[in-house]
């Protein structure tokens, strides 16, 4: 019963409808940030020139769609313009932090941080996919006072997961393998998983690893696997579609996430929903989904020895692995159901509107 409009970043200076997703209109327009660490004067001048034109078009959209609640998924520059729109039309303003947008705050210059701090304090509600992410925002933006904040994770595509069959990703895979998936960058900690394979091998346990994903660290990781004598135990598949990754999850022995930093990694919930045991780094929002010994195993960050110990236990103790998988699946299907999360969104909107 709610009318929804999606607004996305675009290259065009004029507001236009780009497409429709499930009959939901998607509009786009280029929004210029009023601040820039590289070109501060240029950013300010261009924003001043285009600001009236931009606001007129956004006001037209707000009137046409009768907007009474705006949910922003990335702070700048959208928060600047829709924050002003809130002053004109009233309504409820939500700002959501997903992960990198919070972790990268410390890289922004002081002007950008001051602007974000000011706008966050004007928001009706600040949402974070994890409680630790909200704490990160408050620690970086020292002195910021979030009037209201809530933790609300993203949902897992449970209907898609149920429809995916094991084996869709191909048959040229080890019979029993560990899976890790993601962008191959230093932050994802794939190097730690490879180091854990070497340590497990030194203890007499040979583990097979499948890596789904690509990125700038691929060649370094291949070189590392050769140098550590486990190249025959690691299979790099390159980029895979989301459906292929889900299929790999359904056929793997267990899922591994050894990241050095995360927000609330949805890939863990997806692996759990696929009925697989999970082992992950004890960082950021991960402990909010992986409850050590109950829905998965947590290991200290950047500790390949502890990771090796956890992997060996998962692979050798079948009863323990199956218990984690069962309890993790129940947790994921209950807590990361999109319908339940949508009801929580609506509850937050109604709560904020009642306090206006």
PLM features: residue spans?
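Short alpha-helical donor nucleotide-sugar binding micro-motif in glycosyltransferases
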Residues: 239-240, 247-252
């Amino acid at each position: 019963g709610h009318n929804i409009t999606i607004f996305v970043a675009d290259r065009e200076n004029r507001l236009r409808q780009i497409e429709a997703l499930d009959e939901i209109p998607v509009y786009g327009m280029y929004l210029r940030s009023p601040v820039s660490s590289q070109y501060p004067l240029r950013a300010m001048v261009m924003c001043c020139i285009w600001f009236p034109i931009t606001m007129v078009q956004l006001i037209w959209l707000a009137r046409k769609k009768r907007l009474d609640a705006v949910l922003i998924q990335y702070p700048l520059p959208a928060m600047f313009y829709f924050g002003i729109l809130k002053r004109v039309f009233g309504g409820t303003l939500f700002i959501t932090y997903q992960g990198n947008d919070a972790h990268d705050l410390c890289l922004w210059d002081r002007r950008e941080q001051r602007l974000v701090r000011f706008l966050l304090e004007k928001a009706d509600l600040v949402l974070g996919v994890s409680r630790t992410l909200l704490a990160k925002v408050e620690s970086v933006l020292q002195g910021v006072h979030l009037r209201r904040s809530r933790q609300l994770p993203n949902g897992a595509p449970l209907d898609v997961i149920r429809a995916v069959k094991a084996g869709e990703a191909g048959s040229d895979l080890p019979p029993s393998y560990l899976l890790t998936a993601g962008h191959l960058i230093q932050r994802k900690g794939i190097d730690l998983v490879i180091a854990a394979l070497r340590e497990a091998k030194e203890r007499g346990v040979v583990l097979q690893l499948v890596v789904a994903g690509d990125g700038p660290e691929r060649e370094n990781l291949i070189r590392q696997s050769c140098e550590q004598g486990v190249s025959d135990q690691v299979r790099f598949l390159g980029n895979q579609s989301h459906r292929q990754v889900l299929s790999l999850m359904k056929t793997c022995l267990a899922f591994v996430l050894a990241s050095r930093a995360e927000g609330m990694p949805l890939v863990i919930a997806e692996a759990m929903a696929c009925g697989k045991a999970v082992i992950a780094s004890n960082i950021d929002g991960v402990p909010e989904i992986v409850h050590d010994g109950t829905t998965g195993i947590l290991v200290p960050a950047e500790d390949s020895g502890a990771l090796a110990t956890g992997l060996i236990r998962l692979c050798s103790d079948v009863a323990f692995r199956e218990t984690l998988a069962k309890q993790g699946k129940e947790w994921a299907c209950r807590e990361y159901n999109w319908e339940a999360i949508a009801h929580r969104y609506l509850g937050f909107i109604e709560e904020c509107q009642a306090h206006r």
